A protein has these predicted regions:
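Beta-rich interaction/scaffold domains
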Residues: 21-154
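C-terminal motif of bacterial Sec signal peptides marking the signal peptidase cleavage site
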Residues: 15-19
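Positively charged n-region of N-terminal signal peptides that target proteins for export
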Residues: 1-6, 21-22
Length: 154
């Protein structure tokens, strides 16, 4: 009886290692997109309220209103213009500037983006008074260096 169980177990294992895939399948195309398709910005500040658990001041993040977006895929540039929304308090409106905003962008499917030439990491507060460069690498390995420029109107 034990011998039969071992034989059955070996048979099940042998069948489980068999692949259902056919050989000589066609190769699927690799994503070749290395473009920036949209841009966004936020302003973060320390609010007056405290977090109950820690007692630390609450960090508030509000999205800036995008008023213009010019994307040039051939030149690999994106120019973003943002405005301070009306729901900001007068105190916070006066504090918003390009020295401390958070910028994020949307890129092509399966692409990877890295900062170049000392540019700040996207998604963190940074100085956007000057243009920054980022390399967008497509899944097929092609890389394009993009320049992101931001403008703020109050």
């Amino acid at each position: 009886m034990k011998f039969i169980k071992i034989i059955l177990a070996m048979l099940v294992m042998a069948l489980s290692f068999n692949s259902c895939l056919e050989s000589n399948l066609e190769d699927l195309p690799t994503f070749d997109g290395n473009d920036i398709t949209a841009g966004y910005a936020w302003y973060r500040y320390v609010g007056e309220d405290k977090i109950n658990v820690s007692g630390q001041p609450q960090v508030i993040q509000k999205q800036l209103q995008k008023t213009a977006e010019a994307i040039d895929n051939k030149a690999a540039t994106i120019n973003l213009t943002f405005a301070v929304p009306s729901n900001f308090s007068d105190k916070e409106k006066s504090n918003v500037n390009l020295n401390n905003i958070v910028v994020a962008v949307q890129i092509s499917s399966a692409a990877v983006m890295t900062p170049v030439e000392g540019s700040p990491a996207l998604g963190t507060p940074a100085d956007w008074t000057t243009p920054h460069k980022y390399a967008v690498k497509a899944a097929n390995g092609e890389t394009k260096v993009w320049t992101i420029t931001c403008t703020l109107t109050k």
